[in-house]
């Protein structure tokens, strides 16, 4: 059984993943896969450098993720170019990791922030959505990334609204409350997995 985890930006996916890992389950983290592919010499690093030139690199040749983010979020054409380049490479890498893990794990998870946007729904037997309302999401993103309201709204707008993700979810984990409530919901869902009725 493969379970997809998703949610909006700053919805609390990282906390959910920590609880799942602590319970002994394997989680493929799409953001980490992307990070690795963007390391100097990686497939995405080379593809992005080819598309945008050396202006997206730091003095030491590493990818300047902050500069790249600014370029993408401020220019829809750059975002479209980057997405077209990255999505295929990322999909291939995630598929390889999924197939490898499926050989040894009966149940595992994949944390994919843009799961619905990129059409990964068919990969999963179940999808867990980490949900927060719009106001909570905005406040958490501003605090976490030290962004002003305008920049935070811009980042949120680059994803499918979280309300539109709900119909795809087999489980909605509500993270509008405190940490303890969130953890209890995840533990309860994991218990149901281990002891299906």
Swiss-Prot record:
Protein name per Swiss-Prot or TrEMBL: Dephospho-CoA kinase
Domain of life: Bacteria
Lineage of source species: Bacteria, Bacillati, Bacillota, Bacilli, Lactobacillales
Record's keyword annotation contains Transmembrane helix: no
Domain DPCK intervals: 2-197
Pfam families the UniProt entry points to: CoaE
Listed GO MF terms: ATP binding; dephospho-CoA kinase activity
Enzyme Commission number(s) from the entry: 2.7.1.24
Record bears the keyword Cytoplasm: yes
Gene Ontology biological-process annotations: coenzyme A biosynthetic process
Catalytic reactions on record: 3'-dephospho-CoA + ATP = ADP + CoA + H(+)
Cell compartment(s), UniProt: Cytoplasm
Pathway(s) the chain acts in: Cofactor biosynthesis; coenzyme A biosynthesis; CoA from (R)-pantothenate: step 5/5
Organism, as annotated: Streptococcus pyogenes serotype M3 (strain ATCC BAA-595 / MGAS315)
Role summary: Catalyzes the phosphorylation of the 3'-hydroxyl group of dephosphocoenzyme A to form coenzyme A.
Binding, ATP: 10-15
First and last residue of the signal peptide: none
